[in-house]
A protein has these predicted regions:
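Short, positively charged and aromatic/hydrophobic N-terminal segments
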Residues: 1-3
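Active-site loop-to-helix "anion-binding N-cap" substructures in soluble metabolic enzymes
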Residues: 5-254, 260-261, 266-335
């Protein structure tokens, strides 16, 4: 990349490169061309829009994306997801350029646990180890003994001695589920994902009445009553594998962010997937699916501009990076 590209003040204010693009450009083709020129790969989370998943070199959940980031040969990674995922890429491949198409793509779950609060909590609980969900900032990971994703949380926790004292955060629902299946009593941080917290048992029951044959799949970030009525509980990758491995099932009710429907429908074209609508407050107007507005900040235009101008890049300071990478590497070695 030409390091001399002037990063404009307005880009910094907006958090992304906002430059006009010729309307006649075939953005998908141009993005692939830029990837070739810059030796870049595009990593996309299942919750991004379908057209981004279609042009990505690799689509996956947090665990698969972390693995890919650790092993890629490419000089540049464009992380189409949210900010903590781009940080994870940078931690695992510090010598690579990591682009995040829109720096505003945060995460309500990562925001629910501030490093200074966790540091204080750790000091109040000597003798406890910290296990953090991957949906956390690098600064929180630096205070962590081991990281988990929803795809490997049980496996990682099972590797700790049964009498180990553990603080688990920031996702209360995931921690509560892991406590219930492992018989542990981990101390749980009270954080949550604003998308998964909106799923209700009532909405699932209503869909189940309309589609009695459908199998209910729910993400582990959902509340306990929702998980209690689900037939399949797990990460997005768990849901995808289950649907692929059970061709006899023709209908599913899905309680997770709606972006996963793209990959589910692509892999299982003869199956019908019903997204659970979010719970609406009294008098509110509901929509048919539950979306993460942060994931949806990623767009073809922003990806094109980030590749063209080599910005926004994600950096992690060396002091934090040296401590933050250890718990991620520990997780990868365990899973």
């Amino acid at each position: 990349y030409n390091i001399n590209v002037m990063v404009k003040k307005e880009w910094i204010e907006k958090g992304y490169v906002d430059e006009p693009i010729d309307e006649i450009l075939d953005l998908k083709a141009e993005i692939r061309k830029l990837c070739k020129e810059k030796d870049a790969i595009i990593l996309a989370h299942y919750y991004t829009v379908g057209e981004i998943q279609d042009i990505a070199d690799f689509v996956g959940d947090s665990l698969a994306l972390a693995r890919k980031a650790a092993e890629t040969e490419a000089k540049v990674m464009v992380m189409c997801g949210v900010h903590f995922m781009a940080e994870t890429c940078k931690l695992l491949s510090p010598d690579k350029i990591v682009l995040c198409p829109d720096l505003n793509a945060g995460c309500s779950l990562a925001d629910s646990c501030k490093a200074e609060d966790l540091k204080k909590y750790k000091e109040e609980h000597p003798g406890y180890q910290v296990v953090s969900y991957v949906n956390t900032t690098a600064a929180v990971k630096a205070l962590t003994d081991c990281v988990v994703t929803s795809g490997n949380a049980k496996k990682v926790i099972d590797s700790f001695p049964q009498d180990a004292k553990i603080i688990f955060g920031p996702d209360y629902n995931l921690g509560n589920y892991i406590n219930s299946v492992t018989g542990r009593n981990m101390l749980l941080w009270n954080g949550g994902c604003h998308v998964h917290e909106k799923f209700s048992v009532e909405a699932i029951i209503k869909l189940k009445q309309e589609h009695p044959e459908a199998v209910v799949m729910a993400h582990l970030e959902c509340k306990a009553p929702v998980l209690a009525v689900a037939d399949v509980k797990g990460s997005t990758a768990t849901m995808l594998h289950y649907a692929q491995e059970h061709p006899e099932i023709k209908e599913y009710i899905i309680a997770t962010e709606a972006g996963i429907l793209h990959e589910l429908e692509r892999n299982c074209p003869d199956v019908i997937f019903y997204p659970v609508p979010p719970e609406v407050s009294e008098g509110g107007v509901g929509c048919s699916c539950n979306e993460c507005e942060y994931m949806k900040m990623n767009s073809l235009k922003k990806i094109y501009n980030s590749l063209k101008f080599g910005w926004p890049t994600v950096e992690v300071g060396p002091e934090i990076a040296k401590d933050a990478v250890k718990p991620i590497e520990k997780m990868l070695s365990l899973s």
